[in-house]
Structure formats: structure tokens, C-alpha cells
């Protein structure tokens, strides 16, 4: 007998993954732009959040492009969280390009080139195009053939007759034979809802008409209603691209589909460096589209974390790039005080950034959290991770975060949760926290052990 067993659906695939900033939903401001004490995943940092709220308003009003902001504060004070909240407030339509200072260094490509690539990634272009389309349910699909002009017994398709039906009428179209190939590729049959672009002849199958929903088919079909209005209509199509997408499209022309072309592409794994001339040409085309009203430029946000890792050459290039006609809003974050600028030997500057660039920055300061705020953060974070804490355990974690770091206290939550469930408890207790603390030491204790030990090389 053949053994057949049912596979139970696993819930593991649908479980949400918890990242460091999963709980951040926005800046948590009210209608007047004032920050609430606890809102949007944030606790405290009222002045910094209000400052970021003003920046968001300026970005939306398109009055902020080509300027730079510095988020300055100690470790674990929410600098990255603020940058993420800015992107959440701006929404998915505004480009947000995050990177770390060390990402700009590469053996293959110049660091200034990598910076410019990310600059262009953070600038969006919204292209609005009005297209004439024929849309409806296919009622007739008849290819008409003619004698082969080259002679012989074969026949060629001279044109295709397609009948389309919409809510307001029907139309019969005579189409070019090249469109018949597109119809075959989309596997269009009578009863399907399609649209055909008048200018390009592109065919798109939308789905099966819901009039055929009672049919029994082995394949799962997507049933769509009969299109409203006339068969022939004008449709506005909005496309969002970045300037980097346009650069790449022009820098890497597609080769042929033959084996030699494909092998040639495989043999070139090196990154293509986009020239200034190409970018200038792309900018000219973009400017023409903007003047015609076809496209709209959307300056986004380029977030560079650990800005103190950038060197003097990148900072010099950044000064020039910020003054260009097309520039995004640059948000830098640094947790350093007075430190040497990388790439120099004796230039000591605030946050590791040269004085001439510091002068161009709007600086937003983040302050260390007090014990009550830390307690609230741990409580909220434990709720995100679906962990229940006893009040005593919460107090111990808050104390620990005050003396060590907030990150260390938050990182102990998951191990303490596992220890608690292993012991058969529903809530994390003080014992679980102490056991996790014994198993995983913090940076200060590790330093003390190394100072008092001679057993290390």
C-alpha cells in the first residue's frame, strides 16, 4: 500500500522576524509637531524627534535638498532609530538609502564613485505618462494568414482580428502580426481580460473574466471584473525610478541572447564605473522631462551611519556633491567626540568631521536615557519579542542598562526568555536574568577580566 501523509502547515514561516528597530513606526509627533513622551516606538528624545519632524516637513516641501544633518550622541541613544523614523514618516515613495561609513571603501571602485552612486540612489524620479490603451474581455481571437512571400507551401500571419468587450461596448481590432507573438506569450484565450498599448503594441493579460468563474479548472485562475468605460481609453501610468537606475540602464547596454553574449557577461564580474559624462547626459534628459512636466524630481534621504569612518577625501567630495544642482538630503550619524579626522595625522575635529563640513551641518543632539526611560524601553521591547517579565526582573534589567549599556540589557531578553521557558515558567524572573548575566558577560566585565589576567597572549 502506498503511504500518504498530510503535511501540517507550519506557523514558523509566518512569524515576524524581530530586528533591532522593528518597534520603530514613526517619530511619534502630534498635529502641532510636538513629540509625545512615548509614541511611535520611541521613548524620550523629545527635542531630537521634534527637530527631525521639522526636517521631514522641509523634505516634503522640497526645501531641504542639498543640505546635511548630523545626528550626534553617545552609543545607544537612538541615532539610527531617528533616521529610520524619518524614512517611515516620508513613506515608501521617497527614496531612503542607508549605508555605513566603511561601505564606501572598495578595491575595484573609487570611494568617491561609490558615494556618488549612493547619492543617485537617494534621488527619485516620478514619471507620469498618459498612454492610449485598448482594454476589455477577449470575445474573438482569429489570426488571418496569407501566402508566404518567399514562396513555398508555408503560410504567414498577415494580421490578427481581436474582439474586445467592456461595460460600455465592444470593438473589433485588426492588429499587426508582431502583436500575435505577444498574445501567444501571454497565453491569451477567449474570456481573458487584456489591455493593449496603442503606441508600443505591448499586451498584458490582467486575468480571467469573472463571467467564467463557475468553470472548473485545474489551474488556479485570477478572476477580474469586466473593465469599466469604453474599450479605447487613456490611462495615466506613474513610474518611480531613481537616477542610479537610469545610470545603470545606460551604462550597461543589454547584449544579445546568444550563448557568446551570455558567456561574455559572465566573464565580466567587475563592477562598471559610471562616468561623469554619462551622468551629465542622464541629467540633461531628466531636466528636459521635468521642464516638459512629464517627470518630477523627488530628493530622498542618504543616511550615512558611523560618519567618523569617512576619510578626508570623501569629506572634500561631499562638500562639492552637496552643492550640485541635484542632491539629496544627507543625514550623518556619529558617536565620537573630539577625534582625529581619518586620513590625516594631526587634524582633530568634533565628531571626526572636518570644520568646513561641520559648518554646513544642522546638528541634532541625542541625549542619554534616564532610568525610567530605560525601563519603558525594555518593557516595550519585551512586548515586541513576545516575552513576559516580572516587575523585579524589569527593575534589575533597567539597573543593568544604567551601569553597562542599553544594548546589553536588551540582548539579555531572548536568552532569559529561553532559560525561563526551559524551567517551565511563563514569565522571566530575577533568577533567569541573573543566570543569563552569568552566562553572557558585558564589555566592562570583559575589560576587567583582561586587565587582571595574564593568561591571554
From Swiss-Prot:
One GO molecular-function entry: 3'-5' DNA helicase activity
Predominant localisation class: nucleus
GO biological process entries: box C/D snoRNP assembly; chromatin remodeling; DNA repair; regulation of transcription by RNA polymerase II
InterPro entries: AAA+_ATPase, P-loop_NTPase, RuvB-like, RuvB-like_C, RuvBL1/2_DNA/RNA_bd_dom, TIP49_P-loop
Entry coiled-coil feature ranges: none
Keywords, sorted A to Z: Activator, ATP-binding, Chromatin regulator, DNA damage, DNA repair, Helicase, Hydrolase, Nucleotide-binding, Nucleus, Transcription, Transcription regulation
GO cellular component, one term: Swr1 complex
Family to which the UniProt record says this protein belongs: Belongs to the RuvB family.
This protein's name: RuvB-like helicase 1
